[in-house]
Amino acid sequence: MKKNILNLALVGALSASFLMAKPAHNANNSTHNTKETTDASAGVLATVDGRPITKSDFDMIKQRNPNFDFDKLKEKEKEALIEQAIRTALVENEAKAEKLNQTPEFKAMMEAVKKQALVEFWAKKQAEEVKKIQIPEKEMQDFYNANKDQLFVKQEAHARHILVKTEDEAKRIISEIDKQPKAKKEAKFIELANRDTIDPNSKNAQNGGDLGKFQKNQMAPDFSKAAFALTPGDYTKTPVKTEFGYHIIYLISKDSPVTYTYEQAKPTIKGMLQEKLFQERMNQRIEELRKHAKIVINK
C-alpha cells in the first residue's frame, strides 16, 4: 500500500523535474537504455534521445519527502522510478515535437504554475523562520493538560454500521433488530447491513457493514461519540445523524484507553503549536501587505 502511494505521489514531482531538465544532445538519436561505465560513474541512470536521467532529476521528490534517498531504495523501486522518468521524458519529447509547449494554453498554464510555486516558496520560507522559534515548555505543557482527553488518549473500537437516507428507515431497521433474541442480533444486523446500507464500500463488499478498527478522531464526531459509548455486543437504539445520513452502529469490541504521557506527546504538540503560530504569522503578514497595497474590487 505504502509503495503504491509513494509511486503515485512521485509522478507530479518527476514531471516538474523534467521541465527543467537538460536538452537532448541529439534529438534524432534512438532511445537508449544503457549502463555504460562512463555514464554510471557520472551518475547517469539512463538516457532518452541523448538526454541524461540522473539522480538530481529526483530532487523534487526529496523536497516533498525529506526522507527520500534514491540510494536507499530497493532495486525494484529504483527501476520503477527510472522507468517513470523515462516515460515522462518520452511524453515530454512528443509534446515538444507537437509544439504544445508553444501554445497559448500551455504558456498560460506555466504562468499559473510559476505564480503558485512562488507563493508556496514564500510560505515555505515563512515556515522555516517559525521553526526557529522556541515554543515555551509551559505553553506546551498547558496545551497537553487542556487537550489530553481529546487528543492524547488512544482507544480503538471495532464496529459495524448501517447507513440509510432517512431517520424513519433507520428506526425501522432498529425495530427489526430489537425483535431478535440477543444471540441473533449481530447476525440480523449483518443481514440488514448487506441488504439496506447505502454505504458503497459496505454494499460492494457485503461485509455486514464492518468498518474495521478506528479511533475517535477518524470518524465524524457524533458517530464516534455514539460508537465509543456502546459496550461490545450492543447497538445504538436511536439513529445517529451525520453529514452522510443516518447510522445504526453495532459495537464488536473496544480497547481500553491508553493515555500518552506529556513526553510522548511533546513532538506532536510542538508541531501543532508551530503550525498555529505559522498561520497567525501568515495572516498578520498578509494584513500588513494589504494595508500598503492598492486593492480595487470591481462589482
Curated annotation (Swiss-Prot):
Enzyme class: isomerase
EC nos: 5.2.1.8
PpiC domain mapped to chain residues: 154-253
Reactions it catalyzes: [protein]-peptidylproline (omega=180) = [protein]-peptidylproline (omega=0)
InterPro entries: PPIase_dom_sf (IPR046357), PPIase_PpiC (IPR000297), PPIase_PpiC_CS (IPR023058), PrsA_foldase (IPR050245)
Keywords: Isomerase, Rotamase, Signal
GO MF term set: peptidyl-prolyl cis-trans isomerase activity
Signal sequence, renumbered to the chain: 1-21
Name recorded for this polypeptide: Putative peptidyl-prolyl cis-trans isomerase jhp_0161
Organism placement in taxonomy: Bacteria, Pseudomonadati, Campylobacterota, Epsilonproteobacteria, Campylobacterales
